[in-house]
UniProtKB/Swiss-Prot annotation:
GO aspect biological process, one term: dolichol-linked oligosaccharide biosynthetic process
Highest taxon of the lineage: Eukaryota
Keyword Glycosyltransferase in record: yes
Pathway info: Protein modification; protein glycosylation
Transmembrane segments: 80-100
Descriptive protein name: Alpha-1,3/1,6-mannosyltransferase ALG2
Keyword entries, A-Z: Endoplasmic reticulum, Glycoprotein, Glycosyltransferase, Membrane, Transferase, Transmembrane, Transmembrane helix
Organism the protein comes from: Candida albicans (strain SC5314 / ATCC MYA-2876) (Yeast)
Localization: Endoplasmic reticulum membrane
Membrane topology: Single-pass membrane protein
Role played: Mannosylates Man(2)GlcNAc(2)-dolichol diphosphate and Man(1)GlcNAc(2)-dolichol diphosphate to form Man(3)GlcNAc(2)-dolichol diphosphate.
Similarity-based family: Belongs to the glycosyltransferase group 1 family.
Amino acid sequence: MSKRQENKKIAFIHPDLGIGGAERLVVDAAVGLQDFGHDIIIYTSHCDLTHCFEEVSSGQLKVSVHGDSLPTNLFGKLHIFFAILRQFYLVCWLIFTGTIKNYDYFIVDQLSFCIPLLKMFCNSNCQVLFYCHFPDQLLVRRTSFLKKLYRVPFDAIEEYTTGSSDQIVVNSNFTKQIFHDTFKKLNHIDPQVVYPCVDTETIVDTNASSNSEVSKFFKDSPFFLSINRFERSKNIELAIKSFARMNKLMVTKAIKSFARMNKLMVTNKKPRLVIAGGYDSRVAENVEYLAELSTLCDELNLINFTIRGKLIMMPPSVDVLFLPSISTQLKNSLIQQTELLLYTPPREHFGIVPLEAMLAKTPVLAINFGGPLETVVNYNGNNLDEATGYTETGDFTKWSKIIMKHYNLDESTKIKLGENGRNRVINKFSRKKLAQSLDNILN
């Protein structure tokens, strides 16, 4: 623990306290700093106690909601305008009630609009830290000239307000470089890197029921796993194409060894690909993308099957299994029992799923770009003392060779890769490490 003269009063300001990756980071940071003895509260414009993390719903963290009565959009448009309006309302409440004077630090993330107001009205010793997950202006699709014109003032506001904070931190060295490339007027600022985390203090959230459900369902048949939201940006087709290519390589190799092929046919222990993740039938892209992935399987002669709910039965001929909207316990059981996690997003600025896999002693294959280069240590055959998986370009032919190579590795090497991954997460990506990094910066 870092040394402090006294515990501080710290307020987080976050737009919508749901269950996304940004919210997970805010909750972990808040709990970690609270465990260090600081007085913590989270201010937000929206928090549904039936759709939030347990630390929030249980009351472990204090949460104060202001501005939820204001709309989030107008006919599906103007999202950024209303996000700013809701945050403005929240900060006005802090100002007019005098509450803004109560804190030693404000930690703001996602939306930087309020920072100049906080600086103007907070007490003279108060400091504001901004946590930049990724520049908001790079997350927006500018599909028309009007949309580009509409974003101009908001992009300028983002750059100005971000630069007005006392401290800026980012979630990876990759995001740090993007920060410099995007905010040209802030080239005098050098953000510090504070990595997101996973909770390493508690046992991975599985139970005997979900573990048994997975093992009985697959009957000791090996499977590879891809976990992502069903969104096109997640590049899940890379996993499918790689798996299809690997299947062809395996068949070619098996034909040369008839006995091995016969064994696979008799025991039905052929490897499968499981694609699981966030899915909402109300979201058009989720529905469309799942259909597109199923069509891709058909084109590649991969028999695919979709299960919504409990794992009970699937045809033995299935190659690819889709599992939309699975529980946390089932997700973690799949991670623990898979041969290899296939992490396919091409421009991920960090990525929590690889950490979850490594914590569960599961090796990871990820694209060698962005955040995963900072979390996954590539196994090159000579670094078994530290490797945790594989990083490779997003070429499905190269991925297929790595998948097959890993599948045929001796068990001791697989175990060592898994142990390395868990140790790396505990040492570099724990909640205590996150809180300690923030605590050091604030002090």
